Amino acid sequence: MKKTNLLSSLVAASALLFASLSFAADETQQDANGVILSGHDAVSYFTMDKAVKGYAGISAVHDGAIYHFSSEANRDAFKANPSKYAPQYGGFCAYGAAIGAKFPVDPTVFAVIDDKLYVNNSANVSKLWNAKQSKAIALADKKWSSIREVSAGELEADDDLDD
């Protein structure tokens, strides 16, 4: 009887864990292993002004996503203040968020503006985003709360950025 209750509890706990990880995966742009930014070190964007590949052995979890780091010092800085280093819009394309969509990113296409990390889908998309950067950030900030928990496939892009 005790084994049955324990098993039931473990199954229920596992279901809750997987549900929370699945939920978080919709809120952050991750690979199949749950890694964000394709394994690039989130802190390096700020300290080195470039995308530096991190190591799986030096990692931290934030908002359901696994972050890799190029050094323990960077990991520790991230853990001390993850909201400072985590990419905006869950690591989805900043331009996409501005038009109400979630697109994957190329983590080497980025900008740090006002101490916030923005990543985009490609160099071409980044050019579009840069041309209307202030408006794009304002729109994305406004829209993110309503699209954050919606899966990418359920969203339809709009043309608000073109107005």
Cite the ranges covered by each PLM segment.
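Charged, low-complexity intrinsically disordered segments
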Residues: 23-163
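N-terminal signal peptide c-region/cleavage motif recognized by signal peptidases
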Residues: 19-21
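Bacterial N-terminal signal peptides that target proteins for export
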Residues: 1-10
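Generic hydrophobic, helix-prone segments enriched in Leu/Val/Ile
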Residues: 10-11, 140
